[in-house]
Amino acid sequence: MARPALYEHRRAGRRRRLLLPLLLAAAGAAGAAPPPLRGGPCQGRRVAYRHRAEGLGAAEEELGAGGCGRPGVAAVASFNGCTAADGWGRLSVTTCAGFDAREQMFGAGYVEGFVTGLQMELYWANYAAAEYPAGAPPAALRSWMAAQLDWAREQVDAHAESEPRWAAMGLILAHYDGLVAGYNQSSLQRGGADDGGSAAGRAGPLLDPLTIYMLGSVGDLEELNGMFGGGLRGAGSAPREEVDRLMDCSALVKVTEGDLQAAHATWRSYYAMLRTWKRYDFTSALGRRLSVASSPGLLHSKDDFYAVVGDGGVRLVVMETTNSVFNQTHLEEHVHPESLLSWQRASLANYLAQGPFEWTQLFTRHNSGT
């Protein structure tokens, strides 16, 4: 019978999240998904990322079967954005063998950005309007995020060939780079026709690469917004209603005869209810398959809820709860850009860990305090 592993507190920053990696007793748990659609079918899309020898590839509509079996295809995706029945869009992304892992992960991000570009714009519009009095993050916060991204790239360049975790971090950044490129193609296509989308009639993409990086880091921004005084929370001592607002998430683990069940409730703001259930099959790139409760533009969960199946019998469920820490001085002393964001450390652990204890050890390295 599987049992919970050790968990690790985040020692720095405003919040302490408890990320609980659990060994799964049921082999098929990474196929976990929300209840099936109860309404009529919605029109979905299938796309493929085709590698081009001369450089950047492109997404193209998949009009028939084939997927990874087609020449030059490094990743495929299917997406159904219908949320009326139960609130969830569905995204499935598969990497294809025959290319190096970075090209596959770039392709995985590309097809996701291409099919969910409009949803990414809508999610950021909701987020920025709700979180920033000026409607956009302050310049100092953007500079901090840019510095953190630059530091992460520098570490990958310096250590990827000798350290597996930095090699995996390189794949995470390739995933993000692909998301940006796919979104840009999506925006270009939507901007060329007045289809009612947010890109219609616009000369260029609504979201620049750094904004997409911030969109993908909204969990970490919960601390950083307050640190830079650009969020509605501001700085200093938090009133009781603010404390209550940031006490996030509940997790349930139940042991039954011959099985272990896990459930999670995320306490998200109403503006964050653009939700997407994602299935990532990165078997050919990373030896992992993940089922993730997520949102548009996020390459992780943020809730957090993951079910992970990996080579060698790896079976993990990862859930997050939050104990908030409201200490502005502590935040300013310990949070710096020479670190890895929470979602990056969680992704590293999901991709590399062979068990719960190793998961927590990977997660604590280069802790950003966010």
Segment roles from a protein language model:
Residues R10-G31:
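Cleavable N-terminal signal peptides of Sec/SRP-targeted secreted and luminal proteins
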